[in-house]
């Protein structure tokens, strides 16, 4: 006996007294029965919520609600599929699970989610065989009647929903692929569950009899004693065994050292885990494609990082330019300081001379006047210097704006050149010329006029070539349009012919219907005559018994004539039908011949068009000109 079936088990024998509150011998059917591989996520029930009855009586809930691993066993009614097979998000999730399983387990081909949107029947057979080999390693795809073999395998595995034979022929169709991919995901769940069961220790296996395994013989002896005592009480007429249930529970708890104080903590832990699972499921429902959103966020962040790196590079280059300017300005400042020191020394020397020297009042006045003039000159020069600096600042701003606009125009020029395939030199229309403008606007050697002269000549050459190509293409297009117009005219004529043939067929159909109506009228007339003759026969039988033989003979004659007339009518109808069938076949053949002729004309025109496109147009014109010249010579000679 298995240990998992000891604590709460239904009675193996029927009750003597029928009790509506007790369970019968039928297998209980769970309405929420899930398929194999779907784990039950129902909330755990308290082990003490129901009163225990017989050890084999009502089963007290002591854990999660058990679901069938092999589908529903009771009844053959068709179960409605609760899965949202019409939901695109659900189907895409199933396809991703299938793709991940195949790639992780070494499938022979590298698959993507896009390649699994609508696979062929051959690919489906390979995928099914690869997955099913995890359950049955010796399985091989059947050479024939796979449409019967695969649904049978799913049915044997306990797949709760039916797969039709027709769905095996159109696996990749939009109306059948959701059912197939859901079945494959169910099969993957089966494989995962089998792998888990194989990897686990055989905890629930029956201990071998006769060996001193841990609690093995005690357990078997305990169960056998309980069974014997319950059976004895059952044979005596009892249906409930509460005292034996209580006794065996106590002995089992002692045997397995069950601590009831930990049950509440375990139940709280179980409830916490269930709440955590529900929270994670809600998060998954709210964010079904969180990985894709995180990848997009990662890509945007990487793009921002790249932008910031480019910005830092530009800042570093700008900082380098500023350092160069600072160094040049510092050198100028040092030179200015040296010049200022020299001027100060000169002023000291002159002041010393002035102190040692005696001046007259006129000299002092003259010196003051010269000093005033020099101060005015210095103020004027200082003002001019400030104005020059302000002008230089404005010129630098204009230069920066002009440089920025030139760089924008250069980038736009390069962008347009790549778009029209002129850049790089190896592009389609570059003809080996380098149209890229790579110049440093800060350097004095750069000259846009040099690049303008370098690029202008090849551009003019390419422009002239393009105009020639455009003119030749325009001429070709006009010729093709004329040819298409001729073809449309020919097709219109053929359509008119087909319309005439259809009108003739309709007329023949009307004639046939008229003949059928005439035959029906003849038949009705003969039926009415037969009815009148039958009435006449009845009158003769009731009125005159003597002329019965003569009336019978007359009736036979009339019947023979009727048969002859019916035979003639059938022959006429058969002839009319044969004629009509021949006419319809002739019309259909004629229509088929016309369609074939039109198809040949179309193919011929396409071939001529291809040959026409391959041929040199000027060669045909030259030949035509020569022919006209020859005809003109002949006419002149005449």
Swiss-Prot record:
Span of the signal peptide: none
InterPro entries linked to this entry: DUF5595, Kinetochore_Ndc80, Ndc80_CH, Ndc80_sf
One example of a Gene Ontology biological process annotation: chromosome segregation
Stretches the record annotates as Disordered: 1-55
Subcellular location: Nucleus; Chromosome, Centromere, Kinetochore
Entry's family note: Belongs to the NDC80/HEC1 family.
Role of this protein: Acts as a component of the essential kinetochore-associated NDC80 complex, which is required for chromosome segregation and spindle checkpoint activity. Required for kinetochore integrity and the organization of stable microtubule binding sites in the outer plate of the kinetochore. The NDC80 complex synergistically enhances the affinity of the SKA1 complex for microtubules and may allow the NDC80 complex to track depolymerizing microtubules. May play a role in chromosome congression and may be essential for the end-on attachment of the kinetochores to spindle microtubules.
Protein's UniProt name: Kinetochore protein NDC80 homolog
Species whose genome carries this gene: Xenopus laevis
Gene that encodes it: ndc80
